[in-house]
Amino acid sequence: MDKRLWVGVVSIFPEMFRAISDYGITSRAVKQGLLTLTCWNPRVYTEDRHQTVDDRPFGGGPGMVMKIKPLEGALADARQAAGGRKAKVIYLSPQGRQLTQAGVRELAEEEALILIAGRYEGIDERFIEEHVDEEWSIGDYVLSGGELPAMVLVDAVTRLLPGALGHADSAEEDSFTDGLLDCPHYTRPEVYADKRVPEVLLSGNHEHIRRWRLQQALGRTWERRADLLDSRSLSGEEQKLLAEYIRQRDDS
């Protein structure tokens, strides 16, 4: 049976998620039935005419905090829509576990996700304690809300659904999939601004091309994200290719 993913999003700006449902690979996954994406707006679950979803924080301080009841109403309907699927509830938060490709692979194993996109200064901590299974962050910086991180997560996970990409090998060759940055890529013309496409890529020798791409990925990772190599065990071939890359770089 094909792997399919159901995603529910709780957000006061559901329109933002048209960027996911209407464009690119994620849109194609929706049309293929691989990805189901539905949004619930907490404002619908308010009881005042202003549809208030936030209030002042206890203890004072700047900003507002999202109230529990509207979030609970939206979450309850999202859970019901998930049907018999076991949905993991995720809050996008700067305090969460940082999203990496390894984490994306973990999330891609789930059958259903409910993503809580906060706003303002955040959401009432008691909602998190009562309802949230995991908190995830996309980096050590501050955004205006959880919608963009939620879209990043959905896009990254969708790429791993079988059939979502046009080429079966595309996801496996992405940066970080094997713990390395990606190698350089080239297309026509062969010469641009006196810079030629590397001859090995024009050779037609698949083994030479494979080794060149692996060496470039190793070298680029060593130059730009050496920390990734600290957590990765290099094979004998990889050690030789990286040593050769460094030697050629030092000689140039």
UniProtKB/Swiss-Prot annotation:
KW Transport (keyword) present: no
Reactions mediated catalytically: guanosine(37) in tRNA + S-adenosyl-L-methionine = N(1)-methylguanosine(37) in tRNA + S-adenosyl-L-homocysteine + H(+)
Localization annotation: Cytoplasm
Free-text function comment from the UniProt entry: Specifically methylates guanosine-37 in various tRNAs.
Family under the similarity heading: Belongs to the RNA methyltransferase TrmD family.
Subunit structure: Homodimer.
Protein name as annotated: tRNA (guanine-N(1)-)-methyltransferase
Gene name of the encoded protein: trmD
